[in-house]
Amino acid sequence: MNGDSPFTEYFGINSYDDSQDNYITVNNGSDQDAVVILKNITSKKIIRNVYINKHTSYDIRNIPEGIYEMKCVYGNDWNPNLLFNGMKLGMFQSNVHYSSQANYKDYFNMFSERTENGISIPYYEVTLHKVSNGNMRTKKIN
């Protein structure tokens, strides 16, 4: 399942830009699997949904330029046959909770920048468990 896109039928086909070598590394250090969702804050479009197994990492690559908010669905016991709004999308069956970035300052700026030394390509690393003195705040969502 690691790297699968379980909500594509609901959100649409994932968007990629092969001309961009940017990425977000997601380290899921928690005891729950997660589906990470990237939403472009300008267009409001969900451009990616990625399943990340507990205690694994995954690189979300070739993200179209833009500024993105990350939302997560966490849980255990994935059931691919569960229905959502009449669609068979699947969902976790236990320990389900949701989170989103709490502050716009934590959004991901995925615009490449030309510098005097060349092109600066954005990359980020996110850890999906509580980190003491961590630098990204989340809020619970429904």
Question: Residue spans of the language-model regions?
Answer:
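Primarily secretory-pathway and cell-envelope proteins
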Residues: 1-43, 48, 73-142
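Short, acidic Ser/Thr/Gly-rich low-complexity loop/linker segments typical of extracellular
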Residues: 49-53
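Exposed aromatic-hydrophobic patches
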Residues: 57-62
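A short tyrosine-centered beta-strand micro-motif
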Residues: 68-70
